Design a protein with these regions (language model features):
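Glycine/aspartate-rich loop-and-adjacent alpha/beta segment that forms the canonical ThDP
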Residues: 215-281
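N-terminal hydrophobic or amphipathic helices/low-complexity stretches enriched
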Residues: 1-16
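N-terminal capping segment at the start of a domain
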Residues: 13-29, 177-179
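Structured core elements
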Residues: 66, 173, 209, 234-236
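Glycine-rich beta-alpha junction loops
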Residues: 71-72, 76, 179-180, 214, ...
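Thiamine diphosphate
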Residues: 112, 116-119, 124-227
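Short acidic, glycine/serine/threonine-rich loops at helix termini
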Residues: 77-78, 106, 156-158, 184-188, ...
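Cofactor-binding active-site loop characterized by glycine-rich and histidine/acidic residues
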Residues: 20-24, 35-159, 165-166
Length: 281
């Protein structure tokens, strides 16, 4: 990746993080930690990887994206706003009654949402179904789904993984946001799903493990996934929960807590300073 592209992605990711904090603060509820950890992944997907058109969000030939860890919708919404699906002003109305952006993705109410999600474990099943439909219809689109590391404790994840492998869904790419923390504590202590890579390999997936905040690594992983034949792919992205906001990083308490006014102002100052530094390069 050239330096100009990388700089632009970092700048956009900083704006996505600002949007996450803005939305969750105004809603007085939501899930900032996992949204921030996935911000770089959302950014790369919507600005480099996905074949999409914000002016034609229902294009039958578009790539599909399913946010299986639907509670991290603030990150997805912030990326969609930056990509032009709707105004960034909508982020300030997150979770408001009747607003476009609800607490979990709603495919009927929000442009750019391919699947309603939030019940953990179900998104991957929907994504696998979309991928199979693409095969049946002889379509070239690809399907992507972002899962949480705590989410993969759900049995339905592995039923869908078995289905995807059995049907040779090489047009399906999963991303696991492995930030190591879930609502009840460290993932390793709650159910201990590791080694995740070996599990997916046993289920017939092509597996890569990367730094989920390194755009060069993200680019290389998605490029490789598109070369894989006759099997689905999974990218295990090692990330930092709360990435970008110093007091939120690696703190389980920020899984599903909104910042108060003082915390909001601190977060916005940090993220704005980071953005200005990037824009000054």
């Amino acid at each position: 990746m050239n330096s100009c592209d990388k700089q632009q992605l970092k700048t956009t990711a900083a704006k996505v993080r600002l949007g996450i904090i803005e939305g969750v603060y105004n809603a007085k509820s939501g899930h900032p930690g996992g949204s921030l950890s996935a911000a770089d992944i959302f950014t790369y997907l919507y600005f480099k990887e996905l074949h999409i058109d914000p002016q034609n969000p229902k294009d039958p030939d578009r790539d599909r994206f399913v946010l299986s860890k639907g509670h991290c919708a603030p990150g997805l919404y912030a990326a969609l706003a930056q990509r032009g699906y709707f105004s960034v002003d909508e982020l300030k109305k997150l979770r408001y009654i009747g607003a476009m952006l609800q607490g979990h993705p709603d495919m009927k109410g929000t442009p750019g949402i391919d699947m309603s999600s939030g019940s953990l474990g179900q998104g991957i099943s929907a994504a696998a179904g979309m991928a199979l439909a693409g095969k049946i219809d002889n379509k070239d689109y690809r399907v992507y789904s972002l899962l949480g590391d705590g989410e993969i404790e759900e049995g339905q994840v592995w039923e869908a993984a078995m289905f995807a492998s059995h049907n040779n869904l090489d047009n399906l790419c999963l991303i696991v946001d492995f930030n190591g923390l879930q609502i009840d504590g460290p993932v390793s202590e709650v159910a201990g799903p590791e080694p995740i890579d070996k599990k997916f390999e046993a289920f017939g997936f092509d597996v890569q493990t990367i730094d989920g905040h390194d755009f060069d690594a993200i680019e290389a992983a998605f490029a490789h996934a598109k070369t894989v034949k006759s099997k689905p792919s999974v990218i295990i992205a090692k990330t930092v929960k709360g990435k970008g906001v110093s007091y939120m990083e690696n703190q389980v308490g920020w899984h599903g807590t909104a910042p108060n006014k003082e915390q909001y102002e601190t977060a916005m100052q940090e993220l704005t300073a980071a953005l200005h530094e990037l824009e000054g390069c």
